[in-house]
Amino acid sequence: MKGLSGSRSHHHGVTCDSACDSLSHHSDRKPYLLSPVEHHPADHPYYTQRNSFQAECVGPFSDPLASSTFPRRHYTSQQELKDECALVPRTLATKANRIPANLLDQFERQLPLSRDGYHTLQYKRTAVEHRSDSPGRIRHLVHSVQKLFTKSHSLEGPSKGSVNGGKASPDEAQAARYGKRSKSKERRAEPKARPSTSPGWWSSDDNLDGDMCIYHAPSGVMTMGRCPDRSASQYFLEAYNTISEQAVKASRSNNDVKCSTCANLPVSLDTPLLKKSAWSSTLTVSRAREVYQKASVNMDQAMVKSESCQQERSCQYLQVPQDEWTGYTPRGKDDEIPCRRMRSGSYIKAMGDEDSGDSDTSPKPSPKVAARRESYLKATQPSLTELTTLKISNEHSPKLQIRSHSYLRAVSEVSINRSLDSLDPAGLLTSPKFRSRNESYMRAMSTISQVSEMEVNGQFESVCESVFSELESQAVEALDLPMPGCFRMRSHSYVRAIEKGCSQDDECVSLRSSSPPRTTTTVRTIQSSTVSSCITTYKKTPPPVPPRTTTKPFISITAQSSTESAQDAYMDGQGQRGDIISQSGLSNSTESLDSMKALTAAIEAANAQIHGPASQHMGNNTATVTTTTTIATVTTEDRKKDHFKKNRCLSIGIQVDDAEEPDKTGENKAPSKFQSVGVQVEEEKCFRRFTRSNSVTTAVQADLDFHDNLENSLESIEDNSCPGPMARQFSRDASTSTVSIQGSGNHYHACAADDDFDTDFDPSILPPPDPWIDSITEDPLEAVQRSVCHRDGHWFLKLLQAERDRMEGWCQQMEREERENNLPEDILGKIRTAVGSAQLLMAQKFYQFRELCEENLNPNAHPRPTSQDLAGFWDMLQLSIENISMKFDELHQLKANNWKQMDPLDKKERRAPPPVPKKPAKGPAPLIRERSLESSQRQEARKRLMAAKRAASVRQNSATESAESIEIYIPEAQTRL
């Protein structure tokens, strides 16, 4: 409050210059009064309409009580405003309204000035006399106050010369002051009619000198807060409006000051309010914030409309630098800067920074929403201004306003944020002010569903179409992919990794090209599960393209970095099918949408789709996706077509046309060429969730339900003639399958099994340790539902059954060996020990674990074990299983040695770790050769046993150990571009 204290001294100095030597005499007090005849408000056009103001003047003069209460009404908080203001109506009711306006001048001139109110203040006169003897010091304080206010954000616009230099007369300065605070005039109302008893204004300053009370109470009129007593109001206003030195000099002659001030005072409800507004307009920011917040409640724009319109059109209503107002120029009318805009400089600065695009998406007051609308439309696309369907105005729900902003911003900024390398951000977006807001798209997409779809779809379609129409030319050119690295999909390393693990199928016209054809990529956006037809509704005429076969499926591929969960659906199909599917909204995934690559794919998809259905991008050897190899291709046959029709499938795969034979696909005889990475085929009734650990991959499902012509091509999934992994992949009726794409160390699995795991368990997922254990055969239809899903009781029961079958096989074999061979007693003892231990383990611990699994599956079980409990118990069970496995391992080694007892050296070697077996220090050469032979046999047996022992742990570490799934390991270095 240094500025306030300085202003106080300034204020008093102004009054003291003309009357400091006559302060002690009552008769000399008249200079402090406005000249009633010359400058009474009744003489001014602003006051002619307000008889209440003139009448109000009477109250203080003729009411000694009101005058004498002036010192006692030195309130200490703004809360007393209402009490103070209550005095004005009472005084007016008693005397003021009974006195005509034309008698007021004479009345004021004849009144004895209510000396009793002044006598109560005489004790403070000495402080004023001490201060009034140095006008130069007061001028210095005036300038220091001006400098302080110049530094604050709420004063001193650059165009105001009347503040800094004597460019304006006191009249102009006063008008400018009131013009700047015209909003506070509007904010004022009758309860604010604070008597000019400046104590109320100074109540927050405890160290206020009482001398200012002298200058505001020299006449009783000031006690009642009347404006005609210009001596007080003028000094008050001049001092705290930091008037120029010329204004200070002019204020030394009270009459001049009175005239200049009164002539320009825009009168609102009450003049005390006016003085208070002028005072509060010059407070520092913190003080002004209090005043505004209290005064803004009482805005009465209708009462002051005429004055504010007549006056300050040339004034800037708030002394802030004009360039900081983003498009808000003073208009002089009721649509001036809203009061909430004047609260603090930081608020103004925040308003100035709005165009940066950094503003949050939380709802703001309507002016701020308007500003955001303007700046956003500038920053996004020129085409957005052409939208009439999306004038995001107050008619729309505020939720839709904000979210459509963030959605459009997120969709538009994708093109410059980690987008294609060949895309020019400056060419795509006119404004570079976008920020990377990964969560904007997520928020917008996930909450759009809360708004009615009828409200959203129309707007978003038009908005997206206009946004993407600006981007289509550049983006589609970039998608031609003649240059490596343009396409963000990790297809090259992705398929390269697949290529190593899959075999070539000559019968099925497998096409493995060493140098993959770079083809135009056609993409269609993957939609969030909460939004239908958000980006993919484009009805532009597609370019003419060669015909396609009717046997090509609607395809989407998936590949994922271990650090980013891009969600890209690359689809290919017939034109009509593409249009239908684009509206289907069935391409859902639980992958997070916060990756900018997902948005990049969405933009690319939309741009590609603008030109037409994705299926028609076939010219120039266009394939659906840029790929490097064909994993396996399946011919389109009619086998099992009836069964396939019964099972609606969702498929994931890559379909690629041969670059050398682009037109060959037009012939129905030529089989379609597929690059099958994996097939995610789900029954319609199977509601599986895609579970992942570490946003490694995404599986995108494409709907095939409406198209019968897809059945032929996808039926070949069941073609058993395909060798290698794909033959195994498609060796069953494909109503369900799993796809696993694994980044480095991160595992993703798409569970596709039904909730009832009643089918037989195939121990083939547990590689049998020994060739004599026959794997249990299963029906292909039952294998359809087998998948490695979350580890519940069903899953552990299957593991337990596999271990039981394996141990029973060992026991049966050893018992058979015991019967068939005449074995020594020690070896028989070992066989009985191993078999007994295995049977005991199966009878006790296996039984106990089975009960735990059943309790886990029973929702009514009171101490219901969790899956974690089962996993822990299973780990402990593995220790016992391993011990028994070692016993049978020893028996296998004895059998390999023709049931001959091994010497202690061999036992040592056998018990040593397999990598570093200890060899005997001595021994004949033939024995060493024999032991080496036995060691190799033992190691083979040990390998088989270790494979069995690792079965569960391998399955736990990799959720896709199933024989019916494909694991694709993509190093993270290859997936991150």
UniProtKB/Swiss-Prot annotation:
Post-translation changes: Ubiquitinated by TRIM3; leading to proteasomal degradation.
Origin species: Homo sapiens (Human)
Cellular location(s): Cell membrane; Postsynaptic density; Synapse
InterPro entries reported for this sequence: SAPAP
Annotated membrane topology: Peripheral membrane protein
Record's protein name: Disks large-associated protein 1
GO molecular function list: molecular adaptor activity; protein-containing complex binding
GO cellular component: glutamatergic synapse; plasma membrane; postsynaptic density; postsynaptic specialization
Tissue and organ distribution: Expressed in brain.
Gene label: DLGAP1
Complexes and interactors: Interacts with guanylate kinase-like domain of DLG1, DLG2, DLG3, DLG4 and AIP1. Interacts with the PDZ domain of SHANK1, SHANK2 and SHANK3. Found in a complex with DLG4 and SHANK1, SHANK2 or SHANK3. Found in a complex with DLG4 and BEGAIN. Interacts with DYL2 and LRFN1. Interacts with MPP2 (via the SH3-Guanylate kinase-like sub-module).
